[in-house]
Amino acid sequence: MFMSQIDKLRKQIDKIDFQILNLLKKRSKIAENIGKEKKSNNLFRPERQASILRNILKKNGNNLNPLFILSFWRSIFLSQINVQGGIKLILSNNISKKYIKTIYDYFSHDIEIITMKSNSKALEKVYNGKNILTILPYPSNNKGAKWWTNKRLEKLYAIAALPFFLRKKKSPSLIIISKYKPEIEKDSYFLYKSKYPIRDKNMILETKSNKYYLYRSNNMINNNDLKIFGILPKHYES
C-alpha cells in the first residue's frame, strides 16, 4: 500500500515535468518570435531579466529558495538567447579566475567564455563585435578597478552589475560592458562620468580616478558636465 501511494505521487511528478517541458517549448517559441519582431542586434537585456526575476520572486513568497529560482531562470534566459542567435562573454585572465563562480551564477554554466590577456583586448572585442560582452571589476578605489577611464569606453556602456542578489549596504563586485545602449526600466540606476566634481543631492560619488569622477544616481539627470556611463538594473537585496 505504501509503495503504491509513492508510485502515484511519482506519476504526478512525471506529469508535472512534462507540463514544464511543454511550457518551456512554448516560451522558447515566443522568445524566437520576439527576436524576429524587434529586429534588434542586442540580444542580451539584463533589465528585462531583472524585471522578470523580481516578479517571480514576489509571487514565490518563501516557498522556494531564491537562489534556486535565479539558477533555474538564468538557464532559461540563456537558452532562449541562444535560440535568437546567442551571446559571447570575453574575460581577461585575472577576472575569469577570481570571479568565475559569480559569473556562472549570473549567466548559468552554459555561457560561452573566451579569455584574453588584458582588459583592453576584451574591450576591443566588445567594440568591434556583435552581441559580445565583457565583465570587469565594479568601479571602486581599488587598484584593479580604475579601468573605467579607458578611452575605448566612450562608445561602450555598463549595462548590469553582479551579483544580482546583494546584501544591503554591500557593493557589487563586477560590471557588464556592452556596445549596445541599455534600456531604462523603473528599477534602474544610473552611472555618470564627469571631468568635474558635481554637487547634487541626487548623486553619490562612487569613485575618482585620473581627474575623472564616477557618480551614481537613481534618477536621470540632465547636466552638460555629465556623460552616461551606464544604466543598470537595481539589485535584489537580501
Residue ranges of model-derived segments:
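Domain-level signature for soluble enzymes in the chorismate/prephenate branch of the shikimate pathway
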Residues: F2-S238
